[in-house]
Amino acid sequence: MGLRIHFVVDPHGWCCMGLIVFVWLYNIVIIPKIVLFPHYEEGHIPGILIIIFYGISIFCLVALVRASLTDPGRLPENPKIPHAERELWELCNKCNLMRPKRSHHCSRCGHCVRRMDHHCPWINNCVGEDNHWLFLQLCFYTELLTCYALMFSFCHYYYFLPLKKRNLDLFVVRHELAIMRLAAFMGITMLVGITGLFYTQLIGIITDTTSIEKMSNCCEEISRPRKPWQQTFSEVFGTRWKILWFIPFRQRQPLRVPYHFANHV
């Protein structure tokens, strides 16, 4: 199933996403320029570490772009409701359209989204049934890339041997300390924020509960898993092959699951 393009016109979301792209570009340029390539040239680190760094960076960027542009599960104006599932649908009191239960109307986007988790300004898009898996990959690779960059920043000053060849004519070399301090500040800030977000997302999937459902307290026991964790993750990622859960380049094939909780509606 191909991914439908979904573009949200929201200046606030553009600014938030632009900030994320800036942090990504800053680290993808500064860390290799100051740390990776100089230490590789002097034999302090193997080249595979540079390949891994760029690999994680590419996966992170692909997940960001696809999570931002993929239709999260917007409902059509005249959906075809299977006769056997009519009791699982309800009328939205904001847009007056029929929708599956567990859908939610996003006031910022102006339409209902299937199994909507929340609207995320950092990707300028809703997180719903069709792009939740990409959002999880974005959280994972952002955290991995941040840890990788912070680790090399620490090793650059406290573990690696001092560099013998330094071109002081380069701007990044003359102002290395200030540049690396800014990179460390952004990295620590990003790591703290993304760790909390990633944790809540994982708990939500394990308990089969969206963020909106948690906030509205519509579930009696949101902390008790109602399905095996392998099943809930497979439903989100659209495959039971765990290795594919980490690949942002593929297309998601949704598993046939109902849009409701057994005891939540």
Swiss-Prot record:
Its EC number is 2.3.1.225. This is Palmitoyltransferase ZDHHC21. The DHHC domain is required for palmitoyltransferase activity. The gene is Zdhhc21. Keywords: Acyltransferase, Cell membrane, Golgi apparatus, Lipoprotein, Membrane, Palmitate, Transferase, Transmembrane, Transmembrane helix. Residues 38-44, 155-185 are extracellular. It is an enzyme of class 2 (transferase). Residues 1-16, 66-133, 207-265 are cytoplasmic. Belongs to the DHHC palmitoyltransferase family. Widely expressed. Expressed in Henle's layer within the hair bulb and the hair shaft cuticle (at protein level). Expression is limited to the post-mitotic lineages of inner root sheath (IRS) and cuticle. GO terms for cellular component: Golgi apparatus; Golgi membrane; plasma membrane. The chain crosses the membrane at residues 17-37, 45-65, 134-154, 186-206. Palmitoyltransferase that catalyzes the addition of palmitate onto various protein substrates. Palmitoylates sex steroid hormone receptors, including ESR1, PGR and AR, thereby regulating their targeting to the plasma membrane. This affects rapid intracellular signaling by sex hormones via ERK and AKT kinases and the generation of cAMP, but does not affect that mediated by their nuclear receptor. Palmitoylates FYN, regulates its localization in hair follicles and plays a key role in epidermal homeostasis and hair follicle differentiation. It catalyses: L-cysteinyl-[protein] + hexadecanoyl-CoA = S-hexadecanoyl-L-cysteinyl-[protein] + CoA. It comes from the Eukaryota. Residues 90-140 form the DHHC domain. GO terms for biological process: adrenergic receptor signaling pathway; hair follicle development; peptidyl-L-cysteine S-palmitoylation; regulation of establishment of endothelial barrier; regulation of leukocyte adhesion to arterial endothelial cell; regulation of vascular associated smooth muscle contraction; sebaceous gland development. The active site is at 120 (s-palmitoyl cysteine intermediate). It comes from Mus musculus (Mouse). It holds the Pfam family DHHC. PANTHER family: PALMITOYLTRANSFERASE ZDHHC16. One of its GO terms (molecular function) is protein-cysteine S-palmitoyltransferase activity. It is a multi-pass membrane protein. It is linked to Defects in zdhhc21 are the cause of the depilated (dep) phenotype. It is a recessive phenotype characterized by variable hair loss, with thinner and shorter hairs remaining in a greasy coat which is due to a defect in the epidermis, rather than the dermis. Depilated (dep) mutant mice are protected against endothelial dysfunction in systemic inflammatory response syndrome. They are also tachycardic and hypotensive. Its main location: Golgi. It is found in: Golgi apparatus membrane; Golgi apparatus, cis-Golgi network membrane; Cell membrane.
